[in-house]
Amino acid sequence: MALLEKLHRRIVDMGLVPRIIALLPVISMLCALFGFISIAILPMDGQYRRTYISENALMPSQAYSYFRESEWNILRGYRSQIKEMVNMTSMERNNLMGSWLQEFGTKTAIYENEQYGETLYGVMHAPRGDGTEAMVLAVPWFNSDDEFNIGGAALGVSLARFFSRWPVWSKNIIVVFSENPRAALRSWVEAYHTSLDLTGGSIEAAVVLDYSSTEDFFEYVEISYDGLNGELPNLDLVNIAISITEHEGMKVSLHGLPSDQLTNNNFWSRLKILCLGIRDWALSGVKKPHGNEAFSGWRIQSVTLKAHGNSGHDITTFGRIPEAMFRSINNLLEKFHQSFFFYLLLAPRQFVSISSYLPSAVALSIAFAISSLNAFINNAYANISLFSEYNLVALLVWFVSLVISFVVSQAFLLIPSSGLLMTISMASCFLPLILSRKIHISEPLSYRLKNVAFLYFSLVSTSLLMINFAMALLIGTLAFPMTFVKTIVESSSEHEVTTQSSNPIKTEPKDEIELVENHMDTTPATPQQQKQKLKNLVLLILTNPFISITLFGLFFDDEFHGFDIINKLVSAWLDLKCWSWFVLCIGWLPCWLLILASSFESKSVVVRSKEKQS
């Protein structure tokens, strides 16, 4: 205790506290910079690890794969008939496919959804199991690019026929043919766990096939694994998919990496995959779904296998990947649990765990907390009581901003007009500039609004970073320029009339604070103030959640055009229950509204101390 007192006296004597308080904006920037650097150094040698299989029972590629040339003619026969299904109705396709599945003993049923169409599924009961566990082989009729999944459907029925002849299965196998990998497949997964009569037990894992080409050959395999709302499949499942694919001689692509970059393994290639992974993880459900996203939320580990190119490996080689994966999963005696559920892949065989990448998002959250502290104490109004009118009004404005944000989130679910939303967002940014002579707030209130805004955003980011790291990092990065919005005090002439505040606050035993509001004749803004107003305007535009996420989509993802990302955020909630839309509306928008309110011109309040009356 004596040591702490001595240290405290030394700090006071050296005057470190005022210096630290004055440097709070710099400390906030350094925290954010540390967050960016800590994520950027992960691809450096020594910062990442090589992937490995944690669950020994999986044993990928330990057994010989039998889905080979013997199945070639059968697969081609199914494919030639599936080509004729392109112009058939969903009912006709499902009835024909269902008859094929029934030929080798599969129990089939059709799940009908008025909004998303029909989904055919069949259950093959395990000869060596008790019927309580299952594996899913999902084949959407149309893939994420709206291409008819001819090769995938042919592989699906061929593999089902192939699996039916094997007596080794201890888990049921469910084959699913949905209209698309998005809402149709998601609705079937929800119905399977709630209302379907024909079921095959708890689903342990799912593999989605995407082979839209009519060619016999393909070049490489893209493996997609990002789930909804920050979920990822157990790393063991991703590892066995990669291990089996490479064991069969095929190259693996992650996050849409083109074929000419698959052999690169240096700092820049790993950094690129890292950035693409964070982007795809944050926007999973908003981007075109691959199919594995549909299984999120039910403790089902899932990946999507997509074939690219038209030369190199034959189609049966592609079929050996799900065969070997099912044989590995079949060995499990319990659910996936040994390996990581939170990770970032830098290459097919290299990854970093949550302990390595989490500090970056934590640093951003701390940066907002420090900005909140700076707005609270680094001004002339630090000694105002916590129960003063300024603090109470700031909390009231925060509550109103929450209500407005909630109304916005619900209104645009009913009327998804991205153009209207962007127009309102852009117009709101100009309000402090347009109404600068009509609406004023007190300077203490401006600082308190910033204090509440940054504190709220820090709490949101901290709550989010454990369950959806990528989204926390994304919104923290895009919203951080808000901390540079400055309070603008209006210019005034020399004479002033003062009024005493009705809230005297004790600071010392014999002193009270007297708040004196300046009532001055305003003069035109100085060039410096005009410059700061324009700077605030630019910062408000760039940090508006809807404008910012739109710009991010346009610059960093070729999939989005115009205001598409706003509509897809809404549809992601309606179709997949992906709550990224509410993160923007309830987590980010209230903070931005508070900063918008704080950027209106303010009137200074003079703080004077007076001797306490007896």
From Swiss-Prot:
<keyword id="KW-0472">Membrane</keyword>
<keyword id="KW-1133">Transmembrane helix</keyword>
<feature type="short sequence motif" description="Prevents secretion from ER">
    <location>
        <begin position="610"/>
        <end position="614"/>
    </location>
</feature>
<protein>
    <recommendedName>
        <fullName>GPI transamidase component GAA1</fullName>
    </recommendedName>
</protein>
<feature type="topological domain" description="Cytoplasmic">
    <location>
        <begin position="378"/>
        <end position="394"/>
    </location>
</feature>
<feature type="glycosylation site" description="N-linked (GlcNAc...) asparagine">
    <location>
        <position position="87"/>
    </location>
</feature>
<comment type="subunit">
    <text>Forms a complex with CDC91, GPI17, GPI16 and GPI8.</text>
</comment>
<keyword id="KW-0337">GPI-anchor biosynthesis</keyword>
<dbReference type="InterPro" id="IPR007246">
    <property type="entry name" value="Gaa1"/>
</dbReference>
<keyword id="KW-0812">Transmembrane</keyword>
<feature type="topological domain" description="Lumenal">
    <location>
        <begin position="41"/>
        <end position="356"/>
    </location>
</feature>
<dbReference type="GO" id="GO:0042765">
    <property type="term" value="C:GPI-anchor transamidase complex"/>
</dbReference>
<feature type="transmembrane region" description="Helical">
    <location>
        <begin position="357"/>
        <end position="377"/>
    </location>
</feature>
<dbReference type="GO" id="GO:0031505">
    <property type="term" value="P:fungal-type cell wall organization"/>
</dbReference>
<feature type="transmembrane region" description="Helical">
    <location>
        <begin position="578"/>
        <end position="598"/>
    </location>
</feature>
<feature type="topological domain" description="Lumenal">
    <location>
        <begin position="416"/>
        <end position="464"/>
    </location>
</feature>
<comment type="function">
    <text>Component of the GPI transamidase complex. Required for a terminal step of GPI anchor attachment onto proteins. Affects endocytosis.</text>
</comment>
<dbReference type="GO" id="GO:0016255">
    <property type="term" value="P:attachment of GPI anchor to protein"/>
</dbReference>
<keyword id="KW-0256">Endoplasmic reticulum</keyword>
<feature type="transmembrane region" description="Helical">
    <location>
        <begin position="536"/>
        <end position="556"/>
    </location>
</feature>
<feature type="transmembrane region" description="Helical">
    <location>
        <begin position="465"/>
        <end position="485"/>
    </location>
</feature>
<feature type="transmembrane region" description="Helical">
    <location>
        <begin position="395"/>
        <end position="415"/>
    </location>
</feature>
<feature type="topological domain" description="Cytoplasmic">
    <location>
        <begin position="1"/>
        <end position="19"/>
    </location>
</feature>
<feature type="topological domain" description="Cytoplasmic">
    <location>
        <begin position="486"/>
        <end position="535"/>
    </location>
</feature>
<feature type="topological domain" description="Lumenal">
    <location>
        <begin position="557"/>
        <end position="577"/>
    </location>
</feature>
<feature type="transmembrane region" description="Helical">
    <location>
        <begin position="20"/>
        <end position="40"/>
    </location>
</feature>
<dbReference type="GO" id="GO:0005789">
    <property type="term" value="C:endoplasmic reticulum membrane"/>
</dbReference>
<feature type="topological domain" description="Cytoplasmic">
    <location>
        <begin position="599"/>
        <end position="614"/>
    </location>
</feature>
<keyword id="KW-0325">Glycoprotein</keyword>
<dbReference type="Pfam" id="PF04114">
    <property type="entry name" value="Gaa1"/>
</dbReference>
<dbReference type="GO" id="GO:0006506">
    <property type="term" value="P:GPI anchor biosynthetic process"/>
</dbReference>
<dbReference type="GO" id="GO:0005783">
    <property type="term" value="C:endoplasmic reticulum"/>
</dbReference>
<comment type="pathway">
    <text>Glycolipid biosynthesis; glycosylphosphatidylinositol-anchor biosynthesis.</text>
</comment>
